[in-house]
């Protein structure tokens, strides 16, 4: 479930030496992005209240955060889902469940220092 995946991602990232800020839903994510100015954002597509696509689009429309890489997370592995993520501005897409290695590889590829939400 989402809490298990979120907790696993948090553990993997902390073990990799990264600072992690978690959000409960899309609105919480937007507030935390504003407060913490992360260098990389992981965005679950199926977040409550404001889904990951909407959250990513709002982040990318904000000039302050448009440059921040967003990696979408989803249990769906369809071409349409990946294309929709690209259309709203995400840089990459990880399919759940993902391994620690896949998650940290994505961080290494996109992170320029700082925290991940």
Each language-model region and where it sits:
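C-terminal output helix
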Residues: 98-108
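Active-site beta3 strand of CheY-like receiver
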Residues: 36-42
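Receiver (REC) domain active-site loop signature in two-component systems and cognate sites
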Residues: 47
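Two-component/phosphorelay signaling modules centered on CheY-like receiver
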Residues: 3-21, 35, 110
